Regions:
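Core segments of cupin and vicinal oxygen chelate
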Residues: 1-3, 9-49, 134-172
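N-terminal beta-strand motif that seeds the catalytic metal site of vicinal oxygen chelate
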Residues: 1-16, 60-62, 109-144, 150, ...
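Vicinal oxygen chelate
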Residues: 4-13, 41-42, 54-129, 134-135, 157-171, 198-238, ...
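Acidic (E/D-rich), amphipathic helical modules within compact regulatory domains
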Residues: 21, 30-32, 37-42, 46, ...
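A short beta-turn/loop motif at secondary-structure boundaries
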Residues: 35, 56, 88-91, 179-180, ...
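Short, flexible, solvent-exposed loop/turn segments with mixed acidic/basic and small polar residues
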Residues: 51-54, 120-124, 174-178
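Extended, low-complexity, intrinsically disordered tandem-repeat tracts enriched
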Residues: 52, 64, 108, 152, ...
């Protein structure tokens, strides 16, 4: 229903600073096209593709590519989805946007805006394995049904430090978190995450002062990017 996942799109007022941050963690740049008339860059670890946009936009947004978008739009509306915007002019990249029940911004484009670099499946970074886009929600049942209707497979709730439902797609997992987070997170996991966190602290990276309720500060942390993106570092037990 959504197409192929393209990127997590975030607004960055200082793209060079954001690039330096992500490259210091081991992510690499992708070659971008000329779809946008403002500065734009993409970094990736091979699983996560993060689009850095100089233009102000709902941040973070989840962006998919769907060919023949104009013809596909009525199928989304048939699900009861109301578009926040839709642009289908002759001289513009066709795109539309809407939000999920938790307020998460979702965008669909008709074509790609970058070319992924060739990376090994196990490309190493300081962050560990990108597991999912973590989305806080006050209504797990409603959010699960919404993402399931879009073609992701919502599994049974998992218990841990907090309750979550994983809505799994072929190229992105959305973790629906019943937790006290003010913003979505990029969730990375590694059994030895405590050592990774210590290394990042030694290198001077900035962390949020408070973790979600129930999460141990020994094995988990919230890394803060220059543009404000939150990266949740865990042992894989969330």
């Amino acid at each position: 229903m959504l197409g192929r996942f393209l990127e997590v799109s975030v607004h960055s007022a200082d793209i060079p600073a954001s690039l330096a941050f992500y490259e210091s963690l081991g992510l690499v740049q992708a070659a971008v096209g000329d779809a946008w008339d403002y500065p734009y860059a993409v970094v990736t670890d091979g699983r996560l593709h993060l689009g850095l946009h100089a233009r102000d936009l709902p941040s973070p947004s989840l962006t998919w590519v769907r060919p023949d978008l104009l013809e596909h739009a009525p199928r989304l509306q048939a699900l009861g989805i109301e578009f926040d915007f839709e642009l289908f002019g002759e001289d513009t990249l066709h795109r539309l946007g809407f939000t999920d029940p938790a307020g998460q911004a979702i965008a669909l484009l008709e074509a790609r805006t970058f070319s992924p670099p060739p990376l090994a499946a196990n490309h190493p970074t300081l962050l560990g394995y990108f597991e999912e886009f973590g989305l806080p929600t006050a209504d797990l049942e409603r959010s699960s049904a919404f993402w399931d209707s879009l073609g992701l497979v919502a599994f049974e709730p998992e218990r841990g430090p907090f309750t979550k439902v994983v809505a799994s797609g072929r190229d992105l997992n959305v973790g629906l978190y019943d937790v006290d987070l003010r913003s979505p997170v990029l969730t990375f996991a590694d059994p030895d995450m405590a050592q990774r966190i210590e290394t990042l602290r030694e290198r001077g990276h900035r962390f949020a002062e408070r973790l979600p309720r129930g999460m141990s500060t020994r094995d988990n942390a919230l890394l803060v990017a220059p543009e404000g993106t939150w990266l949740l570092l865990t042992t894989g037990s969330v």
